[in-house]
């Protein structure tokens, strides 16, 4: 392989004239050393002293030679390999697992870098795969560095890394944009600390073949002297533009590959491979089938055969046969003749790949690239919050990356399946994901990072410091979701994180809804392992539960055997088991839970029986159940990640393990189903939809509507879904329809606030402040209540009743009288919600939850809400005067506790109390029976008792104020 242009003189641009003929890597290393104090440079005082942008064409060695030579700044290349390196590391991020792993292995095996030994001085770290030294050059996916920046302090990062190289920095994934935001903020904070922080501040290098240097230099506030341009490949690439566009790019790609193969039958196998880009796995499978059929024709003509290798992220993660064929030398590969069934040497490999092969991958035998010009990515539309995989023309920058796969070792050929005129019309750069998808799971991270820079400690949208801020409608939707989830609230000065929001912001990758569902699980005493499993199923199965099936013809009936493998024992012998389970659960997510439980049972069975090669037996088990083994493994990994996330922030990931749905009996099963559905409802409340009998459609508060049909459950009145998906109506036209991803029926399981689902009004100024208005006198108490309040009576665990309550009406329960509460509701109240759950025999901890919704912004917000946590019995003795006093005492902040002494081992409020009291430890076996004893504990932590009541020796009610 020839030298990369970084190692050849005369390929520099945008540098002083006297240096244009320098060896680029020498110039770059000298430029860096001049800014390092240990080499005589000055102490850095600005970002210009620590940020360098290198725009280097494909094939220049920016992913290989550059990181190695940067590492050699820290460790001389002549250092003996047996001498362990103990200094700081160099991390080089890659957008994909394939490139991170491949680059590390290639450098470790290269004779050009004898000092770089895999596992000692060079390695890789990705989420599923790791082989890295404790110190050295580490290739990692962007997500690895992002998680470290999210959880570690500035000093911890600085003590670990001397250099951070962000390769393929032009990619605008959400994680990469957030990572750059973190890096910039970290550099600024360390510079503000003066020489103490600046001495060890990491050096940041951004590299790409197609980076927008003006945009990135403006973002980091650096000048042209911080931008170095390097010429790329040493060999030419001929572009073969077609005269006409194609109407069937898959068929045309096959025909083009076959033409190339036949017209270049004398290619040497070491200079013959073809790479074809496809937007998705479905297209890859179809094209692979066509190419295999073409091999049949080649065999009939007695021509050399092609070896077809379909490659996507799943193939890489599993390191399957196709991936191993990609990494092997062509001389060691064989292909079966479809006529004779004998194996023979292929002339060339035809690699059919998604965008995983677009960047950072060097295939030394690659000579031809065929590009249909399409790219598929997730797009989300607001305020409907509906999204899906949309196929659009790839940007020019992506096409240049694809073209750059050839011409690295010898001259190459590029075959676009679109005309040159079309190429000139498409956008130059790809749209960032924060524009096409919205902030999504990184929203709370954006909020926290923005709040850090705000002196008032509030979130202001105009202060978001990103390459591209989120669109206004996407940001408004994210704020709404965070407020409804109880993670964000509007204080006197602006939007602030709640206590739950502060905890949620510490999660590395959980979305707003996922975090809320976990919190609800703790609140309702659900098994958190079940919550984690459900969230993992949603993440992996994506649109529908049938995506877990390993079959081309997928339908719900095929799930039956997989679902039944994980149901509780008492349900396994009923007639028409799957139909009855489907009818009983009325929930795709719970069926997904049982599918995973069956997979888990299989794992335990094989391990307990000490079978050899557990993975092989699990694959066979999945085949019998018609499940994708890879998907089940992904669910297992995702579930473990969620449980680890909870543990990292200090939450018990095995909370109420005994309440798992799979271990339920006949008496507890429905209660646990209700509990899990309640958690889903609270997490995805904005995605509740009611059935409109007149339109025969499901409608929601955002005005969107869709049809939903189930073969067993006919038109349930209320459903909830994790997301609304865009599904193509046809392959020929750019038309989509809305449909729910997974459906959980709420009828009879959850008390749904119907008024909340009414179409919302368009109210301006969500992102700004509230205009000053004259204070209005309070309205009568009666405006507080809805038209009616749904109230569940649960006496025996078998029967439910629902009462309709008029404004001002007194509700009478056995041993209980609760009347209108909390006066002085402001004029701008548009909705209130009062839910009263009275449970005998079952210790539900949620008693009263009052949410007040205001109209001083565009979206719903909780403010001055009161939550009583504890058993209902403790509140039976509270009068209207007690509640009135409570309301005034709690404003603007306070802590409310309802506690039943018999339930101390399971009281949920201990979690909230632990957080409220900071470092003060609360033992779960505490048994304080009197108010003075509790007052002593709270006083030690700075709380003052302001209201207390002890109706009996077993009941306690105290309010404390900070």
UniProtKB/Swiss-Prot annotation:
Location of this chain's protein in the cell: Host membrane; Virion
Q: What Enzyme Commission number(s) apply to this enzyme?
A: 3.6.4.13
Membrane topology type, per the record?
Single-pass membrane protein
Which leading EC class covers this enzyme? Answer: hydrolase
Q: List the PROSITE patterns.
A: DEAH_ATP_HELICASE, HELICASE_ATP_BIND_1, HELICASE_CTER
Domain called Helicase ATP-binding: residue spans: 43-229
Query: Which reaction is recorded as catalysed by this protein?
Result: ATP + H2O = ADP + phosphate + H(+)
Q: Which family, according to UniProt?
A: Belongs to the DEAD box helicase family. DEAH subfamily.
Instruction: Spell out the protein name for this chain.
Output: Putative RNA Helicase B962L
Q: Which organism is it from?
A: African swine fever virus (isolate Warthog/Namibia/Wart80/1980)
């Amino acid at each position: 392989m020839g030298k990369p242009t970084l190692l050849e003189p005369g390929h520099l641009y945008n540098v002083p004239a006297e240096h244009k003929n320098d060896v680029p890597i020498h110039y770059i290393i000298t430029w860096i050393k001049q800014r390092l104090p240990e080499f005589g440079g000055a102490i850095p005082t600005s970002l210009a002293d620590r940020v360098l942008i290198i725009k280097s064409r494909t094939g220049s060695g920016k992913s290989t030679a550059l990181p190695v030579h940067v590492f050699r700044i820290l460790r001389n290349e002549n250092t003996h390999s047996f001498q362990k390196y103990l200094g700081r590391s160099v991390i080089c991020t890659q957008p994909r697992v394939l490139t991170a792993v491949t680059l590390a292995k290639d450098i470790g095996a290269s004779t050009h870098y004898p000092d770089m030994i895999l596992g000692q001085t060079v390695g890789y770290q990705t989420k599923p795969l790791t082989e890295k030294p404790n110190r050295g050059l580490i290739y990692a996916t962007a997500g690895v560095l992002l998680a470290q920046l999210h959880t570690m302090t500035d000093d911890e990062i600085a003590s670990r890394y001397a250099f951070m190289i962000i390769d393929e920095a032009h990619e605008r994934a959400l994680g990469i944009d957030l990572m750059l935001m973190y890096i910039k903020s970290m550099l600024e904070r360390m510079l503000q600390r003066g020489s103490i922080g600046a001495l060890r501040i990491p050096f940041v290098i951004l590299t790409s073949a197609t980076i927008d240097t003006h945009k990135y230099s403006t973002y980091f506030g650096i000048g042209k002297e911080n931008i170095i341009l390097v010429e790329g490949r040493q060999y030419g690439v001929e572009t073969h533009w077609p005269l006409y566009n194609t109407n069937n790019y898959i068929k045309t790609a096959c025909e083009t590959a076959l033409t190339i193969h036949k017209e270049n039958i004398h290619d040497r196998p070491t200079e013959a491979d073809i790479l074809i880009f496809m937007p998705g796995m479905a297209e890859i499978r179809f094209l692979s089938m066509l190419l295999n059929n073409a091999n049949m024709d080649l065999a009939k003509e007695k021509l050399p055969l092609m070896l077809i290798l379909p490659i996507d992220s799943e193939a890489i993660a599993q390191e399957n046969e196709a991936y191993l064929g990609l990494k092997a030398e062509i001389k060691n590969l064989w292909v079966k003749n479809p006529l004779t069934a004998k194996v023979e040497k292929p002339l060339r490999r035809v690699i059919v790949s998604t965008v995983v092969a677009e960047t950072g991958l060097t295939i030394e035998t690659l000579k031809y690239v065929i590009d249909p010009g399409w790219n598929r990515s997730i797009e989300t539309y607001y305020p409907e919050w509906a999204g899906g995989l949309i196929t659009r023309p790839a940007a020019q920058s992506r096409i240049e990356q694809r073209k750059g796969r050839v011409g690295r070792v010898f001259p190459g050929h590029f075959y676009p399946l679109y005309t040159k005129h079309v190429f000139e019309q498409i956008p130059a750069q790809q749209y960032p994901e924060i524009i096409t998808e919205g902030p999504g799971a990184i929203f709370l991270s954006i909020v926290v990072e923005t709040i850090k820079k705000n002196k008032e400690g509030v979130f202001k949208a105009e202060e978001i410091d990103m390459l591209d801020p989120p669109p206004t409608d996407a940001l408004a939707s994210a704020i709404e979701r965070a407020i409804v989830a109880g993670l964000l609230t509007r204080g006197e000065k602006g939007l602030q994180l709640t206590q739950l929001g502060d905890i949620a912001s510490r999660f590395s990758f959980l979305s707003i809804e996922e975090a809320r569902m976990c919190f609800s699980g703790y609140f309702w005493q659900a098994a958190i392992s079940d919550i984690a499993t459900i969230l993992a199923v949603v993440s992996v199965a994506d649109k529908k539960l049938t995506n877990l099936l390993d079959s081309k013809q997928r339908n719900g009936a095929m799930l039956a055997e997989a679902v039944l493998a994980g149901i509780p024992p008492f349900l396994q012998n009923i007639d028409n088991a799957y139909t009855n389970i489907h009818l009983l659960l009325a929930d795709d997510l719970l069926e997904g839970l049982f599918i995973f439980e069956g997979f888990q049972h299989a794992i335990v069975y094989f391990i307990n029986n000490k079978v050899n090669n557990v993975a092989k037996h699990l694959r066979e088990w999945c085949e019998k159940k018609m499940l994708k083994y890879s998907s089940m493994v992904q669910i297992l990994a995702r579930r473990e990640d969620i449980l680890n996330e909870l543990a990292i922030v200090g939450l018990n990931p095995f909370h109420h393990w005994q309440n798992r749905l799979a271990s339920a009996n006949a008496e507890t099963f429905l209660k646990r189903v209700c509990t899990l559905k309640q958690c889903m409802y609270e997490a995805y409340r904005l995605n509740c939809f009611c059935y409109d009998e007149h339109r025969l459609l499901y409608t929601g508060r955002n005005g969107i509507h869709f049809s939903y049909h189930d073969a067993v459950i006919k038109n349930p009145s209320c459903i909830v879904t994790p997301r609304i998906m865009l599904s193509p109506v046809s392959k020929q036209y750019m038309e989509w329809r809305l449909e729910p991803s997974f459906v959980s029926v709420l009828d009879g399981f959850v008390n749904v606030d119907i008024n909340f689902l009414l179409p919302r009004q368009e109210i301006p100024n969500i992102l700004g402040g509230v205009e000053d208005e004259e204070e209005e006198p309070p309205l009568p108490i009666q405006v507080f209540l809805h038209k009616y309040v749904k109230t569940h009576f649960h006496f025996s665990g078998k029967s439910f009743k629902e009462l309709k309550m008029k404004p001002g009406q007194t509700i009478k329960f056995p041993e209980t009288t609760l009347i209108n509460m909390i006066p002085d509701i402001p004029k701008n109240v548009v909705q209130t919600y009062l839910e009263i759950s009275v449970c005998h025999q079952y210790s539900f901890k949620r008693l009263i939850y009052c949410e007040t919704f205001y109209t001083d912004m565009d979206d719903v917000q909780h403010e001055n809400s009161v939550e009583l946590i504890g058993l209902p019995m403790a509140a039976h003795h509270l009068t209207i005067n007690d509640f009135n006093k409570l309301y005034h005492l709690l404003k603007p902040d306070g802590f409310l506790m309802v506690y039943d002494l018999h339930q101390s081992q399971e009281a949920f409020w201990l979690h909230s109390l632990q957080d409220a009291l900071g470092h003060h430890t609360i033992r779960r076996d505490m048994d304080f029976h009197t108010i003075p004893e509790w007052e002593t504990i709270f006083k030690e932590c700075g709380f003052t008792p302001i209201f207390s009541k002890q109706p009996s020796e077993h009941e306690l009610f105290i309010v404390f104020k900070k």
